[in-house]
């Protein structure tokens, strides 16, 4: 008899611990979850702010790694930025408020292309991770950006100007009840970024708590990377 997908559900994938070396000599811990079959695309995940408990195991990211390789053929790459700790361990270095984390993002992107030989790489940021994505995930080989709950606290107009000129697609999921940037403010902030698709999510909050919100976020990810795999199952 089929069972409902639950927060604890872990579907089959090849999972391996990784160590990413930064240009300033730090080792960052992470995990790659690779589909057992065809890879439809790869997704590098930039986590929320570690000063508020953000890490590679933040719930949306862990559930994506537990489900999307099997459900959608998506390879998931997660890692802890410098000084960040999760169940798998702690990355070397110290949290630097998004400054030295630039080197972490650059190293992780390079790891995807050089070590994993990624062909179709997408980058997702959540909260603090959206700032890292918009500021540092600019490698021309990256296909698109996905933003969850972007607070837009440190991303500048100059950063947005880069993406306006660059033209690559950006998708931003904006919670109706966000703590930092709600839909109307996001519309204003992103008004000049014509290549940004804003999706306003009724009833959502900054942390996307609850299985309905998890399913929605994962479905939007799959719609971008592997649309033929929709709809995502809600039971197995």
Regions found by a protein language model. Give the residues of each.
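N-terminal cap/lid segment of alpha/beta-hydrolase-fold proteins
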Residues: 1-41
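Serine-hydrolase catalytic machinery in alpha/beta-hydrolase-like enzymes
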Residues: 26-116
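Gly/Ala-rich beta-loop-alpha elbow adjacent to hydrolase catalytic centers
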Residues: 124-133
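Acidic catalytic loop of the alpha/beta-hydrolase fold
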Residues: 153-154, 176-181, 206-207
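Short alpha-helix in the alpha/beta-hydrolase fold that links the catalytic acid
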Residues: 158-160, 181-191, 213
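Short beta-strand/loop motif that positions the catalytic acidic residue
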Residues: 166-167, 172-174, 178
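Catalytic histidine neighborhood in serine/cysteine hydrolases
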Residues: 191-207
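Catalytic histidine-centered segment of alpha/beta-hydrolase-like enzymes
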Residues: 204-216
């Amino acid at each position: 008899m089929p069972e409902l997908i639950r927060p604890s559900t872990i579907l089959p994938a090849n999972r391996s611990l990784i160590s990413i070396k930064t240009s300033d000599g730090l080792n960052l811990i992470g995990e790659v979850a690779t589909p057992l079959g065809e890879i439809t695309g790869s997704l590098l995940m930039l986590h929320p702010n570690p000063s508020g408990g953000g890490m590679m195991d933040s719930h949306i990211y862990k559930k994506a790694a537990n489900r999307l390789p099997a459900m959608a053929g998506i390879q998931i790459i997660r890692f802890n930025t410098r000084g960040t700790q999760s169940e798998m361990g702690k990355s070397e270095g110290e949290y630097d408020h998004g400054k030295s984390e630039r080197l972490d993002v650059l190293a992780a992107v390079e790891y995807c292309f050089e070590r994993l030989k990624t062909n179709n790489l997408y980058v997702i940021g959540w909260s603090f991770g959206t700032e890292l994505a918009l500021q540092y995930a600019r490698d021309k080989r990256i296909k698109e950006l996905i933003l969850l709950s972007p607070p837009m606290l440190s991303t500048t107009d100059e950063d947005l100007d880069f993406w306006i000129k660059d033209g690559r697609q950006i998708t931003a999921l904006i919670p109706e009840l966000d703590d930092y940037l709600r839909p109307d403010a996001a519309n204003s902030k992103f008004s000049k970024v014509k290549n940004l698709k804003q999706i306003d999510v009724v009833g959502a909050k900054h942390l996307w708590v609850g299985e309905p919100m998890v399913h929605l976020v994962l479905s939007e990810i799959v719609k971008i990377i592997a649309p033929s795999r929709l709809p995502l199952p809600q039971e197995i």
